[in-house]
Amino acid sequence: MSTFKNALPASNDILTRDPLPASHKTYISGEIHPEIKVPMRAITLTNGETVTVYDTSGPYTDPNIEIDVAQGIPTVRKDWIANRNDVEAYEGRIIDPKDNGYKNRTQMETAIAGASSLMRQPLRAKAGQNVTQLHYARQGIITPEMEFIAIRENQRRDMTRRYLNDPEREARLKGENFGANLLEDITPEFVRKEVAEGRAVIPANINHPESEPMIIGRNFLVKVNANIGNSATTSSIGEEVEKMVWATRWGADTVMDLSTGQNIHTTRDWILRNAPVPIGTVPIYQALEKVNGVAEDLTWEIFRDTLIEQAEQGVDYFTIHAGVLLRYVPMTAKRVTGIVSRGGSIMAKWCIAHHKENFLYTHFEDICEILKQYDVSFSLGDGLRPGSVADANDEAQISELKTLGELTQIAWKHDVQVIIEGPGHVPMHMIKENMDKQLEYCHEAPFYTLGPLTTDIAPGYDHITSGIGAAMIGWFGTAMLCYVTPKEHLGLPNRDDVKEGLITYKLAAHAADIAKGHPGARSRDDALSQARFEFRWEDQFNLGLDPEKARAFHDETLPRDSAKVAHFCSMCGPKFCSMKISQEVRDYADKQGLSTEDAVNKGMEEMSQTFKNQGSEVYVNVEDITKTGS
């Protein structure tokens, strides 16, 4: 058995810390709360301009911040939480060997030697207090988290308006928002109101002060989640920490730790103490480990203890499959792929074995009481989601969705934040129906979907089959997309798979923002298009979602530095580049003092005269053309 130390990075050097090309960190201060500093990524262009973009990478891309993974990253929210004076520190539960998948304490202590540096004394709400962002919002309080989010969502829109200053173009491209309320400028008050209404969620456990505030809601930028996690057969703790850092580098707005092997508790400690984004889990996975994988042996008491354990560590949202009811299980019998959710199948098996109602459903208000002590958000799991397009929108799926809507209102009664998980596998023509039903049944609580995959014929390419559905459902109103990697249905993703899945889903989310008409979403596109037209190759690479891949593809055929300033690429070559020809038309127009349209007409007249001078012959000798210079 390898020790805990051997499972961790030998040094901080293993973590990816370099800023992306031509990028540097910039920080914007608050006005209501001047102490806040909102990080963004500034991309410096070769023409002297700067494009500022949303940044999820935390301190890892700021070379001015020293990081020791054994101590964790800076706690940006620590003072905000303390200053509200509604939390208290307490001893917390004692770590049990079963928390880490071991049989006895000696075995566990040997395995996790050296882990104490990351253990924190947990906080909880003082007696009679509620510490959720939803509770504050309903009290009319604009928290530092809310102002932070407002600044972050605006992405220095004042600097990007130069790309959006053509009224005709903006009217033509305004988008279809399907009822979303997209403001020109996000204000802290708007953030507060959206959270108060339950239309948006700020996942922000008081025990995860390292997390930089973000928001999930359809009236904000579409977000992307990345799943990581070890298993009984693959991956070390160190690899999972680096995978989390790697995911945030490429745009993960949240990360779910789905670990199921040994050292689950300790892996989660290391991830949380080093995570600049909210972390989600599926607590039933760890609870199942505690009963040696026998679903029938699960109890409310074991699950409750697991919730408290993870809440004390700082998990920001829990996927809880409380909508898998006993009476819904038979509805899945005629499905092509049955129940494909791990959590859903665990609870279905428990219900059938005991012929009792799902204890997550019967104890739902007890769960609310726990979550509001720490501000853990519900992610109500779709345990009966379709696992194939053949099962999309069936009775089981829709019945569970209605139950999730009922549970949402119970959670809101306790001022606990809620997002709703969605499918799954859904053909394109049925995707909007999913979104419409979710808005209706779940009272506009944010929707969080896995894809959906639009076809089942492409193992190895499911990041694409699902990216299609993700872009569509994001446009229709989904607030957060759970990424799918090329390894979906085939195996656990590695580092490269994580990047591939994230780039695909950031693309889908961005396309959805543009289609919705989100103010400012298209400015980066216009900046890149302008760079492309002006043959600023380095700017094209650096403005893209993956500068490294774009540069590598270009250099496969034109590797020399001189090619980075060439007015052509290897696709068309120097003589057939459409953009070069367009530029020549514009240059000709400028030279002649004409508009582009007039220049084209004048050029046509000149060519017509040349045609007449050559005798109005359709076919002429090449040598004659050469002699006349035409």
Curated annotation (Swiss-Prot):
List cofactor names only: [4Fe-4S] cluster
Q: Which GO terms describe its cellular component?
A: cytosol
Q: Which residues bind Zn(2+)?
A: 425, 489
Q: List the Pfam families.
A: ThiC-associated, ThiC_Rad_SAM
Record-linked InterPro entries: ThiC, ThiC-associated_dom, ThiC/Bza_core_dom, ThiC/BzaA/B
Biological process according to GO? thiamine biosynthetic process; thiamine diphosphate biosynthetic process
Keyword annotations of the record? 4Fe-4S, Iron, Iron-sulfur, Lyase, Metal-binding, S-adenosyl-L-methionine, Thiamine biosynthesis, Zinc
- State the Gene3D superfamilies in the record: 6.10.250.620, Radical SAM ThiC family, central domain
What family classification does the UniProt entry report for this protein? Belongs to the ThiC family.
| Role this protein plays | Catalyzes the synthesis of the hydroxymethylpyrimidine phosphate (HMP-P) moiety of thiamine from aminoimidazole ribotide (AIR) in a radical S-adenosyl-L-methionine (SAM)-dependent reaction.
The record's note on quaternary structure and interaction partners says: Homodimer.
The name under which this protein is listed is Phosphomethylpyrimidine synthase
The scientific name of the source species is: Hydrogenovibrio crunogenus (strain DSM 25203 / XCL-2)
